[in-house]
Design a protein with these regions (language model features):
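Serine-hydrolase catalytic machinery in alpha/beta-hydrolase-like enzymes
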Residues: 7-110
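Short, intrinsically disordered, charge-balanced linker/junction segments flanking boundaries
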Residues: 111-115
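Short solvent-exposed loop/turn micro-motifs enriched in small/polar/acidic residues
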Residues: 1-3
């Protein structure tokens, strides 16, 4: 087993996002995909590790950046501020989820029928 990772940049509504993609390089065929959503801290090292663990199970896994530009925070005050800003904008939630989904769906290793 050889887990590979890649920072995956994508754009939604003119905002740059930095997802974290992981897959088992020893598998050659397309595989099902999983979106890994972070806690309110953002796409931090813990979520990246969980993304890699899901890849070990045979999935193409994408750690999702919900805040943009790969932002992470350390305090509940910062986390609450970023999370509330996203939650207040239903359009932002929908388009950010769709953007991450499309990254996974369009990846060459993805079995787009099993996401």
């Amino acid at each position: 087993m050889s887990i590979q990772t890649e920072n995956k940049n994508y754009s939604v509504d003119n905002i740059e996002f930095k997802g974290y993609l992981a897959w088992d390089d020893s598998v050659s065929e397309a595989r099902p995909g999983v979106l890994v959503f972070p806690e309110w801290w953002g796409l931090n090292d813990y979520i990246k590790k969980r993304t890699e663990q899901i890849a070990e199970l045979g999935y193409l896994a994408l750690g999702v950046d919900m805040y943009g530009k790969g932002k992470t925070v350390d305090t509940p005050q910062e986390a609450g501020s970023l999370m509330n800003a996203v939650l207040e904008d239903k359009h932002a939630i929908k388009t950010r989820l769709e953007g991450a989904y499309n990254v996974l769906k369009e990846h060459a290793l993805s079995d787009s029928e099993r996401l």
